[in-house]
Every structure is written in C-alpha cells, then in structure tokens.
Amino acid sequence: MRRKIVKIKKSYEFKKVYSNGKSVANQFVVMYYMENNLGFNRVGYSVSKKIGKSVVRNRVRRLLHESFRLLDIEIKTGFDIIFVARGKIVEADFHTLKNSMRKLIMKTPLYAGNEK
C-alpha cells in the first residue's frame, strides 16, 4: 500500500532542514535530509527562477514529485527531505532524473533497500 506523501511548505521548515540536515548532490539535484521523529516522511521541492519560466519550473517540480512518489517505497520513514533543482535538470528526461534521485537516496541512510 502506498504511503501518503506529506509536503514541506513553510519556509521555516525548509530553513531547519537546510541548516540542520545533511546533503548529497549530483548534476541534476541537491538532496537535503534530516530525521524528523514523526514516523512518516515529509518532502519539499525547491526550483529557483534560474531554472526557467514558471511553465518550466512547474514541469520540473512535477517530475521531481513523480520520481519521489515512485521511489518512496525504497525510503525509510521518519525523515524530512528537500530536493533542490540544479540548472542541468531542464535537459534531463524523466527516467534520467528518477535514476539520479535513486542514486542519491542509495548514498544516504534513507535507503531501505529490500527491508520492505
């Protein structure tokens, strides 16, 4: 059964993860994460105006969200996660982005592997 994805929306929640969390990055995405002790994951997406106009930014946000939704079963619970888009993300297709996000998750303690 799929878990409900709770989004981080408040700026103070983003700042908390940025300042207290750890990060990993690749050419498309920077991922910040920290434990939240809530028993479920919360996710946020940050796509700056440097990426492009609103149509492009919203498309990137949708791609990030869908990739996370599909990878959610591979992630342990109890974390706040923020994905920050980098400039090259505009050139990436969905499968490239999903694989790059999977590799980032596998580098961190978030990866559950075959536990579930």
UniProtKB/Swiss-Prot annotation:
GO terms for biological process: tRNA 5'-leader removal. Its EC number is 3.1.26.5. RNaseP catalyzes the removal of the 5'-leader sequence from pre-tRNA to produce the mature 5'-terminus. It can also cleave other RNA substrates such as 4.5S RNA. The protein component plays an auxiliary but essential role in vivo by binding to the 5'-leader sequence and broadening the substrate specificity of the ribozyme. It is an enzyme of class 3 (hydrolase). The keyword Nuclease applies. One of its GO terms (cellular component) is ribonuclease P complex. GO terms for molecular function: 3'-tRNA processing endoribonuclease activity; ribonuclease P activity; tRNA binding. Keywords: Endonuclease, Hydrolase, Nuclease, RNA-binding, tRNA processing. This is Ribonuclease P protein component. NCBIfam families: rnpA. Pfam families: Ribonuclease_P (PF00825). The keyword tRNA processing applies. Belongs to the RnpA family. It catalyses: Endonucleolytic cleavage of RNA, removing 5'-extranucleotides from tRNA precursor. The gene is rnpA.
